[in-house]
Amino acid sequence: MPGPDGWDDDAGATDVVRGVPFRPMSISELLDGAIAGIRRRPRTTLGLSVAISTVIQVTSSVAAYFFIGDEARDEVTPDVLLESLGAQLTLTVLGLVLSACGILLMAGLMAPILGRELVGMPIAPRQAWRDARPRLGRLAGTAAAVMGASLGALALAVLPFFALIAADAHPAFGVIAGLLGFPLGIGLMVWLYILLVQAVPAVVLERRTVTGALRRAVTLSKGRWFHTCGTLLLALLVTVFMGFFALRIPFLFVQLVFFGDASGDGATMGALAVDTLGRIVSWSVVLPFDAGVIALLYMDRRMRREGFDLELRSRGRSAAAVIAGGPAHEPAAEPAHEPIGEDGFIDLWRTDPVPARPWTGANP
């Protein structure tokens, strides 16, 4: 039943994207909400996703051409094969790092979209860009910090292995260092990534510094690490299925039919172009899904840990009134001709004191 000023008394009736309740969400609701967010705002989400995916995949393809283009045309010998395997491993790691950075950047851009849906505010096609644009520098810095911390933990754990190999130590020591270092490094990398991933939505919505967003992510993740890990793991499985089996196979088939037996620079460039196009298409679809899950995880943690949904409902007023900063049961002092600015939406999410805006009469 509708409550005062538009809030619904039924906690399950008001939703994020007309399918996800405005309350703490289950894992299935988080995944469904990310998909529904893409369907409801396809032009906004897919437009941002195509831009990010194109940069990532073109960069990967250019690196692939310069890393293995010559080796692919050479006669296959043990040395060439070893160099090719090393290049493939390097390209795989580079692709994973770039993809993870793209997901983090997209999560920061998706946060205002889903945040406005959460409080029932309209979203213009370029609204997400206007919300995130003032924070692009810190968003990129936060994404780099999350990836840097995760990869740094992996590097520190495997450093003894490579140091022993470089020092030509006894093989047994290298084997022991590898058996201990690689699992430990991978575990630390995953643990830190999941612990810090919510810093990306926080730096955009809460207007925090990079270090402040990282501390905020640690606070929000307390006691819910395994829940976050399980949710992101399921999202990864969906991504692999949609991105490879459903979307990449047609392009791989075209690549095999037209360039499978061909040789020469033209065939190499053609096969690489088709493969790049396939990766752009597949990543443009799955990237906003992964990013939406991260953004919704942040909002879920705000509601579970801090009662963000209950805080807004307890004020007994609409989102517009909350943004305007008017008294709980009085109309907002906003002039009819003054539109609600982007900073008003951000004020909903900030946890620090908000400066007063003269036209509302709101107190800091």
Model-assigned labels for residue ranges:
Residues 48-68, 88-104, 140-167, 176-193, ...:
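Hydrophobic alpha-helical transmembrane segments in multi-pass membrane proteins
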Residues 65-74, 113-121, 152, 156-171, ...:
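Membrane-interface elements of multi-pass transporters and channels
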Residues 33, 37, 47, 134-146, ...:
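Membrane-embedded alpha-helical bundles of multi-pass transporters/translocases
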Residues 2-7, 192-205, 232-364:
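Juxtamembrane transition segments at transmembrane-helix termini in multipass membrane proteins
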Residues 127, 139-143, 215, 228-231:
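Membrane-interface alpha-helices at helix entry/exit sites of multi-pass transporters
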Residues 2-19, 85-124, 169-213, 245, ...:
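Selective recognition of hydrophobic, aromatic-rich stretches within alpha-helical transmembrane segments
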Residues 4-68, 188-275:
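Nonpolar helix-loop interface/hinge motif
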Residues 70-85:
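Perimembrane loop-to-helix junctions flanking transmembrane segments
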